[in-house]
Amino acid sequence: MKASVFKSLYFQVLTAITLGVLLGHFYPELGAQMKPLGDGFVKLIKMIIAPVIFCTVVTGIAGMESMKAVGRTGAIALLYFEIVSTIALLIGLVIVNVVQPGAGMNIDPATLDAKAVALYAEQASQQGIIPFLLDIIPGSVVGAFASGNILQVLLFAVLFGFALHRLGEKGQLIFNVIESFSRVIFGIINMIMRLAPIGAFGAMAFTIGKYGVGSLVQLGQLIICFYITCVLFVVVVLGSIAKFNGFNIFKFIRYIKEELLIVLGTSSSESVLPRMLDKMEKAGCKKSVVGLVIPTGYSFNLDGTSIYLTMAAVFIAQATNTHMDVIHQVTLLVVLLLSSKGAAGVTGSGFIVLAATISAVGHLPLAGLALILGIDRFMSEARALTNLVGNGVATIVVAKWCNQLDNDQLQAVLSNKTLPNNEIKSSTSA
């Protein structure tokens, strides 16, 4: 039991952060020299931004069933995803502006590593909507991947996904190759995330050594602010949506409590995808709806990640005294409406998309990611839990709107009257 605790990434990161704080506090000069450890980890994350979003988007779109058969369901699902994700982004933006957890840190962006972000610094965005939209179109596909321009990669991925879907069986080989490549990419992410303790140690030691223990207070405020915001979003926003569609959000949370516990331990909503497919079908949602909404939602309906992205981006601006006027914040929202759709329900994806977003916006210092590197791991639980509840609610709502929901069965399982626990466990344990 003790060995498993020590091997836990959560424990390792927590220990690394503690050691980083102690080193930075008692030996500030030495702590400040640990900055390359955090910078190196950020560069590793940047390395796989483009391929992970390309694979996720392509397999998500190309893996859908017949467009004609599920056209209405897909359109309703995407409309729902866009509306609720936008609400999540706005809520995160409003609360971080009101609470201002990063105000007072007074971190000079010039002290952050410029070399670590040189690749993305070259992509400084031109002001104006027209240049911004034109810049989404790449000069070449290879150029989009080589430069790391995530919006260009995302555009190509969407077009590629639709084209691959139209090929049908003829494109199955290509689909299988990309899906296999996707597994390799996520395997790389898992390996990189094992280095998170080293990166967290370096980033935290540098932050405390350079700016003092007082900077840790603002980091704690960001974590608390984010968790409270996620709880409010689930209870108020998702709760209202659930009530409007005839079910209780708290009963639904109780229904998926086992899945929530798994996600809490893994920090990845993807870890319970097979279980969610099974449980949502047993909750009265037709299989065709469940098969479309749940997998698609893992890229297009990540409410917790949306809240995190706006809060983290503005926090970096506040901490580095980077002024963000209304135009800048609207631009941030527009970019996030696109880039957040490339996130995946795996640990670290939120941080990856945050890096992509900051690089695309161009106004914020990408090296500022080091400020939240040490605490990102501890916000991933709230992200994953909110994402999971959000996708479950979305499935029920879309099923109801498409007349593909057995409401009597839904009410029965939510009331714990006919919940087939044993069957669920046995069918999803493989």
UniProtKB/Swiss-Prot annotation:
Primary location class: membrane
Cellular component annotations (GO), alphabetically ordered: plasma membrane
Pfam families reported in the protein's UniProt record: SDF
Compartments in which it is found: Cell inner membrane
Topology of this chain in the membrane: Multi-pass membrane protein
UniProt keyword terms in alphabetical order: Cell inner membrane, Cell membrane, Membrane, Symport, Transmembrane, Transmembrane helix, Transport
A single BP term in Gene Ontology: L-aspartate transmembrane transport
Homology family: Belongs to the dicarboxylate/amino acid:cation symporter (DAACS) (TC 2.A.23) family.
NCBIfam families xref list: PRK01663.1, PRK13027.1
Name of the molecule in the record: C4-dicarboxylate transport protein
Lineage: Bacteria, Pseudomonadati, Pseudomonadota, Gammaproteobacteria, Enterobacterales
